[in-house]
UniProtKB/Swiss-Prot annotation:
This is Conotoxin Cal14.13c. The cysteine framework is XIV (C-C-C-C). It is found in: Secreted. Residues 1-20 form the signal peptide. Expressed by the venom duct. Its main location: secreted. It comes from Californiconus californicus (California cone). It comes from the Eukaryota. One of its GO terms (molecular function) is ion channel regulator activity. One of its GO terms (cellular component) is extracellular region. The modification Leucine amide is found at L66. Probable neurotoxin with unknown target. Possibly targets ion channels. Keywords: Amidation, Disulfide bond, Ion channel impairing toxin, Neurotoxin, Secreted, Signal, Toxin. Contains 2 disulfide bonds.
Amino acid sequence: MKLCVVXVLLMLAMPFNGGEASRFFNQHARSQRSGMKTRGIWCDPPCPEGETCRGGECSDEFNGDLGG
């Protein structure tokens, strides 16, 4: 019984770890490569309000694009 539960948990976890996570990180890598502006969540520490993360650094040069 216990073995069966473990197998089911593994089967549930595998698609997420393999698919979702890799897609998430591939998306990030693609946006960094192409130079698209990315949100501050990629910067550490996060950018201040109104600044944009670009290549891991904060920049306010995109303020005009944000409609404010």
